[in-house]
Amino acid sequence: MSRIGKKPIDIPSGVEVKIDGNVITVKGPKGSLTKEIHPEMIVKIENNQILVQRPSDERHHKALHGLTRTLIANMVAGVTKGYEKVLEIVGIGYRAQKQGKKLILNVGYSHPVEIEEPAGITIEVPDQNRIVVKGIDKQQVGNFAANIRKVREPDPYLGKGIKYADEVLRLKEGKAGKGGKK
């Protein structure tokens, strides 16, 4: 058995799970998520828990087993708690602001970069140097945060740019090197 796949997923109170063939719908206090899973995976609801089983011990079935269980667990966590990614903007004159459903980034280009807020995602800008991306779909939140970061990735020498709040940057040394001038 897959170490991850064999663990049952507890269904918290207030969450409704519906299985229709290979389509799983999870409804909770924060919203509803629907995902199509691999047709070979067997998903059952027993004793207020979701169980994921695989048809055989073949290598790809083992991989799909853990993946399917994790995707369903992420859906349950998303509709109960939600997900958020925090980005920080580092650099003189670099800032973010929100206008309606648009995020406007001034990050050293000759023009401000405008990014539209997609459906299912909310953007908060608590101050000019922080962006908080929130949503119920873990993959969508992560992808959107990565797209914002891609606008101006952190510079490897100075660290200027957009980075995740928990990201640790290893800065390179300049041309002078360790010894400096001789």
UniProtKB/Swiss-Prot annotation:
GO terms for cellular component: cytosolic large ribosomal subunit. GO terms for molecular function: rRNA binding; structural constituent of ribosome. It holds the Pfam family Ribosomal_L6. InterPro entries: Ribosomal_uL6-like, Ribosomal_uL6-like_a/b-dom_sf, Ribosomal_uL6_a/b-dom, Ribosomal_uL6_bac-type. The keyword ATP-binding does not apply. One of its GO terms (biological process) is cytoplasmic translation. Gene3D superfamilies: Ribosomal protein L6, alpha-beta domain. Keywords: Ribonucleoprotein, Ribosomal protein, RNA-binding, rRNA-binding. Signal peptide: none annotated. Part of the 50S ribosomal subunit. Belongs to the universal ribosomal protein uL6 family. HAMAP family: Ribosomal_uL6_B (MF_01365_B). This protein binds to the 23S rRNA, and is important in its secondary structure. It is located near the subunit interface in the base of the L7/L12 stalk, and near the tRNA binding site of the peptidyltransferase center. PANTHER family: 60S/50S RIBOSOMAL PROTEIN L6/L9, LARGE RIBOSOMAL SUBUNIT PROTEIN UL6M. This is Large ribosomal subunit protein uL6. It comes from Caldicellulosiruptor saccharolyticus (strain ATCC 43494 / DSM 8903 / Tp8T 6331). The lineage of its organism: Bacteria, Bacillati, Bacillota, Bacillota incertae sedis, Caldicellulosiruptorales.
